[in-house]
Amino acid sequence: MKVKKDRKKYMLAGAALMVVLAAAGLIGVLLGGLLSGEDNPNLALGKGVKATCDSVEQEALSAAMAIDGNDADRTSRWSSENNREDASHFIQLEFPEEISVSFVVLKWERANAVSYALESSVDGTAYETLAAFETAPELLRQEIVLKKPVQTRFLRLSTYEVSKESVDYSDLYQNVSLYEFEVYGDKPTAYKLETPVIIKAAEGGRKLVLPETPDGFRVTLIGADLEQVIGADGTVYDTIQGKDVTVGYLVEDTRGREETREVSFLVHVPAADAVPEEVQSDAGEADDALENEQADVEVALAEDGQGAVNACPGWVIPSIAEWKGGRGSFYLEESARIIVDMDSRPYGKEEKTDPAGGHNVKTGESAEADAQTVWDVAELLSERCGKDRDFQKRLPVLEGTEEDVKPGDIYLGYAQEENGLGREGYTCEITDKCVIKAETATGIRWGTVTLMQMLFTDWNEGKTAPQGYIRDYPLYEVRGFGIDVARKAVSLDVLYTMMETMSWYKMNDLAIHLNDNEILATSGLTGSAEQAMTAESAFRLESGVLGVQAEGDYPTPQEYAYTKEELAQFITTAKTYGVTVVPEIDTPAHSLSITKRYPDYALRTSGESVDQIDLGNGKAVALAEEIWREALDEESGAFREAKIVNIGMDEYYGDGEQYRQYLTRINKQAQEAGKTVRLWGSLSNMGGTTVPSPENLQMNIWSTDWADPQEMYEAGYSLINMQNNHLYIIPGGGYDYLDCRELYENWAPNRFYDYNRTETIPAYSPQMLGAAYMIWNDMCGSLDIGISEYDLYVRFLEPLGVLSVKLWGADRIASDLEWQTGRMEQLGAEELAVEPYYTVNMKVRLEENPAESNKPQIIAEGDCAYGKWAFYAVEPETGKVGFTREGRTYIFDYTLPKGEWVYLKVEGEAGVTKLYAGGESFFLGEEKEVDSLGSGEPFEEHATFVFPLQRVGEQTGSFDGELELYMGGNGGGALHADPLQ
């Protein structure tokens, strides 16, 4: 586990390269102009230095402002003209005589230059390029280290292109701006460190050491991006494949002459010799095989008749971190067994119930309540074998040892010794049997997921896996997804499906946003505070404090809520799948569901503020604490099984110091209940003197304006990348789908970038936890456009594979996005709850005189968590054909005649439902070119309908007539050969 260090420092990256991009100290914390004491002054501040430029935005922002030593004042900077047509600019420093330059610091106002160069000249006529860049600076403070000292009189920064990523801002920011242009004759000591080397340790094994520590400096290993390869103490673990690892060191001047810095190195770790004999093979063959990007199971035959070394199974998502190929295949036979090691039994097998069926997992009393067991993992593996449409056999789960394993069996057990695998790593030895080991049950779960992906693919009818040895582990600790279940009700069944699908891709963090309201600024209801109080809102959790009931039928989605027991059980069950559920109660903003019940506690600075709690009101703060006390109660609280809870804290527009004090109180309350706390980062935008402790506090970086990543990193907070412009989904809104190609080709979990800046937090730091994407159901209330649970699921699933690859961090990933997404489509997650497309053909005859003329005539219906789920022959309000789902009713402009047979066809697609009747077509959804769009309600823009078959025709007791119904799917293939009559 990486050890967090609270420190202020500079951060250096890639010290072995000619050009080094480095981080700044805290924004607003200005470090001295001298980087190496009096011996290495900023030469740009010297006497007689002139600064010139091609243009200025305004006269006061001249080139001279970039060499005045003042980087604290926003008015003391150079800014070029704002020219949308031409972003070519320069600023030049002319020195009175030749100087030697080794190190340059550029302090950008905005990191928006995406093509620029540092140039040098001795005569002001002929220039040479010292460093060229085709991407934006990683941080606002950019440090450039030259490969060797350069003699010069003229030093010029030339820019050629700036970011146009944001249409809204592109007209305003077509210029470049520098606070300071600093020049140094020598480079900081941290840049002079030699690359660390791997040696054999005296006690055995391998160790990473620095060749030499400079006199007067203390150098401490911070960590490695792959701590499963290089541990926190420098131990180099036994790898089976060569790995490139980035390590970071803290460099401190014990004399106080230089600033404290972080420096990083790229270290190649060769494979160790400790590989089981059964899978050892010629190193040359194995290396060649690992270069093979083919994603098939076939094993080529060598000329001597022996099987060639197996390539890494490329169809596994995310890709395997380390692979050593063997020869031949493992076959899953019907006689196979799952053997669970006897020492892997923390408590009795008899105490377990089916971990998936009915979503009911019983937790044993003698084990940690928040940890799944190997028995749970084995049961999930057995169940998945039974669900496979070709294999269809649950494997028996037996107690035993590794010696009991026979050919075709699968063994699950704890590793007998620590080898750097950590909480989620595992090994998998595949010969004629399969042996999966890990230090935790979570690691064993991920090993079984890899095995299942090998075995259960549509094209692998033989249920085989290539023999070989796997050592696999993630790059990032948090690999997540979050969903807003407040603005749109989301059934518990859908949450279970999402959780199980995440587990299939080794995504391990599911955030549930439980309370919110429609955005008041767009609601049209802000004429007064009282009017704003009528906006749509929801608190989706049973609460005695707020009077939220969560039992019985829910005729409308607005009333739907989870019981305390349902949520606690969901959190517990998810652990069995290796997924941490993070429940959230969002205050002090986004709290209309609270202030509606307690209107005196609302912030009333405007009509738009009444969804915020007035933190100047002591009773309002006490109410929030009582809500949390109920949720955290160790006996009955909905969050009692959660390891991490989210306390909200975003977009508050009240007093900054009151906000900081409130954050500190709620954080303390949750941590005293034994929880790690997560929140939406907002401290960069909320002034005040109180500094919340970063201890056990995780921060979602959703907006770089509300929480600057570098500033928060310097303050010691643990960070999760949830940057809105890359990772937010607003179904039907501005962020309708994620840009998977952008994520695949340019995005990185530790990189925060937009039109204004680019900041990279080191992956080797324990503070850089990972990333998550999020669905926000902003299109609710007055903006409701009919998004369904299926629409949510489609948007959830599409980027899942790409993000799992990036967050797991395997370096063997496909270079082509279509090939990558193609692999996702081949796999299919475990038992998805919905089918994407269908066709229903039916013959319908309504009675001329039904028994009850005003009752609905239902062709088919199904059970649902809230509202009603049915397809109408006669919708009771209009008498027309239609359907209802999730609290919304959709009407086709067609009325069935009575007493005669009519042929109907219904086609369901994402966003569109089509009815064909009597030679006419009736569409509901986005295909507006078709006549008869129904009632014209805004929610009909998204008319997705999953056709129910739980109860059909007369089985409902709500259909007077005769019916024949045929169901088809995926291009018309029949699911039922005979009509359902």
Regions found by a protein language model. Give the residues of each.
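Aromatic, loop-rich ligand-recognition surfaces of beta-strand-rich domains
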Residues: A16, G32-E38, D71-T129, E138-P188
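Acidic, contiguous N-terminal accessory segments
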Residues: L31, L266-T442, W446-T450, M454-R471, ...
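Feature activates predominantly on carbohydrate-active enzymes
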Residues: N419-V610, K619, R629-A642, M779
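Short tryptophan-centered beta-strand motifs in secreted/extracellular beta-sheet-rich domains
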Residues: L510, F570, M842, E900-G908, ...
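Active-site neighborhood of glycoside hydrolase catalytic domains
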Residues: R604, S609-N696, S703-D705, P709
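Extracellular glycan-recognition modules
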Residues: L832-G887, T956-Q981
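Short, aromatic/His-centered strand-loop micro-motif at the edge of beta-sheets
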Residues: G882-Y903, E929
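Flexible glycan-contacting loops in extracellular carbohydrate-active proteins
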Residues: L924-M967
